[in-house]
Structure formats: C-alpha cells, structure tokens
C-alpha cells in the first residue's frame, strides 16, 4: 500500500491541476462533486445497488457510501463531506482512516438533507457534477454538469496517472485469478451458474462489486454478445466456454475475455488463430496510431480467418468491403478502460469535446482516438455465428460466398472473443492481462 500511497500524492496533484485550469477558464469558483444517492425500487423499501459517481471515484476510493460530496477548486485542500448518519437499521460506513485521508479536509454529514450547512455559503458560482440534478437545483446550483467542464474532464481522464495504472494492474491481477478458477470449473463440468460462483469466490467480490455483469456462456450462448443469463443446468454436450468478466480495485475496472474449447477440434484451432491475431494487433498499438485503423486491421484478420477455415470464399479485402466480416465480427475492437468499463473520452478529439464519430460502416466502435501514452484500452477481436446477422447475407449475392456447411458445423460453439487490457507507453505496450498470468 505504501507504493500506492506514493503514487496517490501525485494523482491528487494532477486532479487539482486539472480543476484549477478548467475553473479558471470557465470563471467558476470550483466544483462540487456528488457521490450520488440511493435509488428506491418501485413500490418497495429496498434500494438498487449503489454505484458512485465516477467523477467522485476519481478522487478517492469511497465506493459504497451515498450522500457524500467533494468540494474542490484546485487551490485549496479538497473538502470531503462524508455521510455518517446515526442509523440502527443499516451498516454505517466507517469514518475513513486510509492513506488518502491526509489529502482531504473531512467533514461528517449526519443527515443527508442538511448538506447545505457544509457546502460553500455562496454556491451560485460553483458547478455541480453528479446525477441528481433535482437536488442540485434545490441547493441553488445554477451550473449543473456544464458541457465545457465535463468535456474537459472526460478528455483528460483517458490519460491515466501512475496511481490509476497501478490500481488497474491490481484489478487485472484479481480478475486473472477468477479466470483461472472459471477455466478449471468449466473443464470439471460446472454449469454456467456454478462457474459464476467459483469466479466470484476466487476474486473475492460479489455480483454488485465486480465492474459489470459477468458473461458466462457455454456453447451457443457464446453467440449472444451480452449474455448475462446463467443457466443452472448443464447442456447435454459440453462444447465451448466464453467468459467475459472483470474485477474492481479502488473503483478501477478490469475487463477480460477468454474462450475455450472442451475438446481439440476445428473450433479450438479457430481460437488459436484468433489468439495469434489478437496479439499481433496489440503489437501494432503505439502512440500516434488511430484506434479505428486497428479496428479495420482486425476486419482484415477476421477475413483471412474466414478464408483459412473455409467459412467464406473470395478475397480478404472483398469480404471486408461487402460487410461479410461485420456479420461475423459485429462489435468494435475495444474501448477505453478506467473508472468505468466503457470509460469516457473515447470519441473526444480535444478537451472541448469535439466528437470523432465512428466510421459509418462500423457504428459500434467505441473508440476513435489517436493513441497516446498512459491510455488504457481493451483489445477484444471476435468471431461469432449469429444467425440474425448471417441471415442478412442470405438475402443477396453474398449468400454464395458463405460456406453454410462450415457455419452449421461451428454454430453449436457460439463464438470466440479474446480480450486483454493494455497500457500504451511511449516506447512499448504493457499487456497487463498476459503479464499477470493469463495466457
């Protein structure tokens, strides 16, 4: 933890520098960042799981305590208004005593609706950052999530501090242990539900603590890109396993995917080919490279796999140009990663929020940035047998280029995705996922 504390000092200094710059530019007194409030289920007395505002998490690892506030201006010591009620019904969060507390002036809030007493006396020139605009209006904030401030913060959040990079390495390290446990469970006959339980046990995090709903897909379920239903019963025949699952550390996410074949067969060979292609794509990452160019290169590699495994005929570029590869690989190559799984800033050309749209032929690409040092991105090429997409190919001349017998052979396996989390450095790439032990 001493290593993390050392980096945290510089992290706070950088966040203060960013705030000082944007509040000066926008002639604001400062920013008031709200952790969030509980959301009550309709007609019930139970709240949905609480998720803290990522702008709040950027400053400190208070992840599970609603009704907290940060008051920052980039000059003075940041103020943390920490919610600490008198409550015999629920567990009250302990007053923090970790290494990061020395960087904050901490005030305790015992009643959520009394926060105005602890906020700046005149907040008319302070900007509110958070979800609850109705609360901000009642408190008197006239500037609520201003576009200029949000765009600036989102653009710069893509450049990670050393503290953030270390948190993300630890999030990867934790997730790797879960992936190894899940792989073992698959080969030992566990159901989707049982694999999920073993994964969560290995990472030591509950369903509401991991950064997103895990995808635990056996056989043809792997063709559903965001499959989150967990079947309790095993399929009649065990063929394949796709797991897309991460872990959290101090609010930062990992996002890792692997695909396994139960037996050595054609599908297993396809996994090997995809793994090779993914590593080649990662080798192409460097500062100055346009992420959309990597995505287009992925389609070229998918096209070659379609030819090599006799899924399609023709030439590789023709398969890309006709949209055939998009039927087999319909999603983007990856995305920014950080405080959020699909982190902000992936389309920002500059700190004013100038938008770089995804290519018209590839609307699901989540990042169009030029790569730069200290960015963290996922690299997740895939190849799937998705009938709703492949059926579109049957409606025109592209039908003649598809080897439907091979498609039928691979359909029960669902699909393949392989995903690593990569730091772009000035002179190299750091594949956290591989370097921390997941082949």
UniProtKB/Swiss-Prot annotation:
Lineage: Bacteria, Pseudomonadati, Pseudomonadota, Gammaproteobacteria, Alteromonadales
Residue positions binding Mn(2+) 1: 255, 335, 380, 419
Similarity-based family: Belongs to the peptidase M24B family. Bacterial-type prolidase subfamily.
Cofactor(s) needed by this chain: Mn(2+)
Listed Pfam families: PepQ_N (PF21216), Peptidase_M24 (PF00557)
Residue ranges the record marks as coiled coil: none
Cofactor note: Binds 2 manganese ions per subunit.
GO molecular function list: aminopeptidase activity; metal ion binding; metalloexopeptidase activity; phosphoric triester hydrolase activity; proline dipeptidase activity
Keyword terms, alphabetized: Dipeptidase, Hydrolase, Manganese, Metal-binding, Metalloprotease, Protease
Function: Splits dipeptides with a prolyl residue in the C-terminal position.
HAMAP family linked to this entry: X_Pro_dipeptid
Source species of the chain: Shewanella sp. (strain MR-4)
Domain of life: Bacteria
GO biological process: proteolysis
Record-linked PANTHER family: XAA-PRO AMINOPEPTIDASE 3, XAA-PRO DIPEPTIDASE
EC number annotated for this UniProt entry: 3.4.13.9
Amino-acid positions noted as binding Mn(2+) 2 in the UniProt annotation, renumbered to this chain: 244, 255, 419
Name this protein carries in UniProt: Xaa-Pro dipeptidase
PROSITE patterns: PROLINE_PEPTIDASE (PS00491)
Catalytic activity: Xaa-L-Pro dipeptide + H2O = an L-alpha-amino acid + L-proline
Gene3D superfamilies per the UniProt record, alphabetical: Creatinase/methionine aminopeptidase superfamily, Creatinase/prolidase N-terminal domain
GO-annotated cellular components: cytosol
InterPro entries for this protein: Creatin/AminoP/Spt16_N, Creatinase/aminopeptidase-like, PepQ_N, Pept_M24, Peptidase_M24B_aminopep-P_CS, X-Pro_dipept-like, X_Pro_dipept
């Amino acid at each position: 933890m001493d290593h993390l504390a050392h980096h945290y000092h510089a992290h706070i200094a950088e966040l203060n520098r960013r705030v000082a710059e944007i509040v000066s530019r926008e002639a604001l007194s400062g920013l008031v960042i709200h952790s969030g409030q509980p959301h009550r289920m309709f007609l019930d007395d139970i709240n949905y799981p609480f998720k803290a505002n990522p702008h709040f998490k950027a400053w400190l690892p208070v992840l599970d305590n609603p009704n907290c506030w940060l008051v920052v201006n980039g000059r003075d010591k940041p103020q943390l208004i920490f919610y600490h009620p008198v409550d015999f019904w629920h567990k009250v969060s302990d007053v923090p005593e970790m290494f990061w507390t020395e960087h904050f002036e901490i005030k305790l809030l015992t009643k959520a609706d009394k926060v105005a007493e602890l906020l700046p006396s005149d907040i008319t020139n302070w900007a509110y950052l958070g979800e609850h605009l109705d609360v901000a209006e009642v408190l008197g904030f006239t500037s609520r999530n201003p576009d200029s401030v949000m765009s600036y913060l989102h653009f710069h959040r893509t450049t990670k501090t050393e503290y953030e990079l270390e948190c993300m390495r630890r999030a990867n390290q934790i997730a790797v242990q879960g992936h190894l446990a899940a792989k073992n469970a698959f080969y030992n006959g566990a159901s989707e539900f049982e694999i999920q339980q073993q994964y969560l046990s290995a990472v030591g995090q509950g369903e509401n603590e991991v950064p997103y709903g895990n995808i635990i897909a056996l056989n043809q379920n792997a063709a559903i890109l965001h499959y989150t239903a967990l079947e309790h019963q095993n399929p009649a025949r065990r063929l394949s396993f796709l797991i897309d699952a991460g872990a959290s550390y101090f609010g930062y996410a990992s996002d890792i995917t692997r695909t396994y074949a139960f037996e050595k067969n054609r599908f297993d060979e396809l996994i090997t080919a995809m793994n090779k292609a993914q590593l080649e794509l990662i080798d192409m990452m460097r500062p100055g490279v346009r992420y959309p160019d990597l995505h287009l290169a992925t389609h070229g590699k998918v096209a070659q796999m379609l030819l090599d495994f006799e899924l399609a005929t023709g030439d590789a570029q023709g398969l890309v140009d006709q949209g055939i590869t998009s039927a087999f690989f319909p999603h983007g190559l990856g995305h920014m990663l950080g405080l959020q799984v699909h982190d902000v800033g992936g389309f920002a050309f500059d700190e004013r929020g100038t938008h770089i749209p995804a290519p018209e032929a590839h609307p699901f690409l989540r990042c169009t940035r030029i790569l730069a040092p200290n960015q963290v991105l996922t690299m997740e090429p895939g190849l799937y047998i998705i009938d709703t997409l492949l059926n579109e190919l049957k409606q025109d001349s592209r039908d003649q280029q598809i080897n439907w017998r091979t498609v039928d052979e691979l359909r029960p396996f669902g699909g393949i995705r392989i995903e690593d989390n990569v730091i772009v450095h000035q002179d190299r790439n750091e594949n956290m996922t591989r370097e921390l032990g997941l082949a």
